[in-house]
Structures are given as C-alpha cells and as structure tokens.
Amino acid sequence: MPEPTTQIKDTTANPAPLGLLGFGMTTVLLNFHNAGYYELNSMVLAMGICYGGIAQVIAGLMEWKKGNTFATTAFISYGFFWLSLVALIGLPKLGFTAADETAMAVYLATWGLFTGGMFIGTFRLNRALQFVFGSLTILFFLLAWEHFYAVEWPGMGGASAGFKHFTGYEGLVCGGSAIYTGLAQVLNELYGKTILPLGVVKK
C-alpha cells in the first residue's frame, strides 16, 4: 500500500500589505519634502530605515517563504533601496565622499530601469499594482532628470524648484497609490468582500 502523504497548509498572514504600506508611507513623507513642505529631516530618515527599509525586507522574506518570486524581489529590493538612500545621505556626515549629482542621476535611473522591468510583471497581477509600479518608474526617472540637470551643464540653468516640486507631487500620488493598494488588501481580506477594488486582471 502507498504510504499516506501529509499536506501542510500555509496559515501565515499575507505580508504584501506590510510591504506596500512601508513603501507607500515612506514615499509620501519623503515627497512632502520634495514638494517643498519641509526640509529633509530625521523623521524621513527614520522612516526610511525602519518602515521603508526593515519592514519591507521582512515582508520580502515572508513572501519568499510563500514562494512568491515577484513580491520577494520587489519588497527586498525596495527595502534595501531605502536603506541605501539613507546611507547615501548619512555617510558623508561620517567623512565619506558624497555622491555627486551625476552619480545620483545614474543611481536613480538604474532604479527606474529596474522598476520598469517590474512594471511589466504587474500585467499579470492587478490594475492597482500596475499604477503603483508605473508611477514609481516615472518618479525614478523624474528624480534622475532633476539630479542630472542640477549639474548645470553649459548653456543649461539646472533643474528649477518648480520641477522638484512637480516631482514631489508625482511621488505623493505614487506613494498614495501604494497605501491604497495595501489597505485594500487588508480590508478586502478582513471583510471577505471587495471594499476597495484592485482591478483584477483576467489571466
């Protein structure tokens, strides 16, 4: 007789809302700064380390346990993006050479390319995530453009404050969409029905 098999049911919670809210709330707070509402301060950096960084990495590890390659890649990557961004801001205070505007432009454009690739993956997921990753791709390239033109090439005046504020508002939209998507998953699961629609994609 064949030996009986034991199936282990996955009863762990959905970690995606944690990752989305960690990303979204930190993005919103940083982009209030970019939009001109306050100076860059320890509140933004602390959020970048704790909620945008560590919490997203934890969410990514939980997604790895569930076998979700896309979410694992996204959350761990963006978690370490926030940690690296805080390091780029903080390390010069410890005597390390600061990244110049060109280096920051390349850094942000590279993240834009990565996010564009992840955006293609959202075509198999839902409309809400498509908006999050699509708007994030645009945000990274706007930020890269801002730093590139801050170099003030001959004949160019550099990026204006208005452009930075525009980029900040785009970032607020991006971060807000991630918050919406995270809360939608929490509320829809809690109530057992669609409270906030995510725009299901037919596969």
Predicted segments — roles?
Residues M62-F70, I120-F131:
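Membrane-helix interface "capping/anchor" motifs
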Residues L40-G53, A98-T110, G168-L172:
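Structural signature of hydrophobic alpha-helical transmembrane segments
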Residues V57-S84:
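Hydrophobic/aromatic-rich structural module bridging two neighboring secondary-structure elements via a short loop
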Residues T72, F81-Y107:
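Helix-adjacent hinge/juxtasegments
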Residues V106-G117, R127-W153, S160-A184:
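Alpha-helical membrane segments in multi-pass integral membrane proteins
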Residues M1-A59, E63:
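N-terminal topogenic module of multi-pass integral membrane proteins
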Residues H33, I58-M62, S84-F96, F114-G121:
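Membrane-helix exit/interface motif
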Residues Y191-K203:
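Short, highly charged, low-complexity non-transmembrane loops/tails of multi-pass membrane proteins
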